[in-house]
UniProtKB/Swiss-Prot annotation:
The chain crosses the membrane at residues 23-43. GO terms for molecular function: proton-transporting ATP synthase activity, rotational mechanism; proton-transporting ATPase activity, rotational mechanism. In plastids the F-type ATPase is also known as CF(1)CF(0). It is a single-pass membrane protein. Belongs to the ATPase B chain family. GO terms for cellular component: organellar chromatophore thylakoid membrane; plasma membrane; plastid; proton-transporting ATP synthase complex. This is ATP synthase subunit b', organellar chromatophore. Keywords: ATP synthesis, CF(0), Hydrogen ion transport, Ion transport, Membrane, Organellar chromatophore, Plastid, Thylakoid, Transmembrane, Transmembrane helix, Transport.
Length: 156
């Protein structure tokens, strides 16, 4: 405990923090001067760099938003064009199917007409040949019947 008492009796040395001599204002001037120097050397360039980066980020975001809006417009436009192309292709396909069906029906009608014509001409030709064959056979029958009659009469 005596060491505490000795410490308490000891006087405060001079030149402390709260002495009112020229050191306190000199230290204040040094702090202000160092603040200006640090501001000029360190804080302003860093502040400029930070501002430039913020401006770059802001402009990049604005550009990205513009590009995104442009992409969305293009996507909507292309989607609409795709819808139109699909609709047009479906129309073309339907028209082509109708045309093919029409051509098929026309070809079928023509083939049936040609088959009917061939059948009719064949029937006429057969009728002509039949008539010629009957006429020829009639002549042969007449000749044979005359021959038979002559032989029968001759044998009597």
């Amino acid at each position: 405990m005596t060491s505490w008492l000795l410490l308490a009796e000891a006087g405060v040395p001079e030149g402390g923090l709260f002495d009112l001599d020229a050191t306190l204002p000199l230290m204040a001037i040094q702090v202000v001067f160092l603040t200006f120097i640090l501001n000029a050397i360190f804080f302003r360039p860093i502040g400029r760099t930070v501002e430039e980066r913020e401006n770059y980020v802001a402009s990049s975001r604005a550009d990205a938003k513009q590009k995104l809006a442009q992409v969305e417009r293009l996507e909507a436009n292309l989607t609409e064009q795709l819808r139109g192309a699909r609709k047009q292709s479906q129309t073309v396909i339907a028209e082509a199917e109708e045309e093919v069906n029409r051509l098929y029906q026309e070809a079928l009608r023509m083939a049936q007409a040609e088959a009917n014509n061939i059948r009719e001409s064949s029937r006429r030709e057969i009728e002509i040949q039949k008539a010629a064959a009957i006429k020829s056979l009639q002549g042969d029958v007449d000749r044979l019947s005359n021959l038979i009659v002559d032989r029968l009469l001759a044998s009597r």
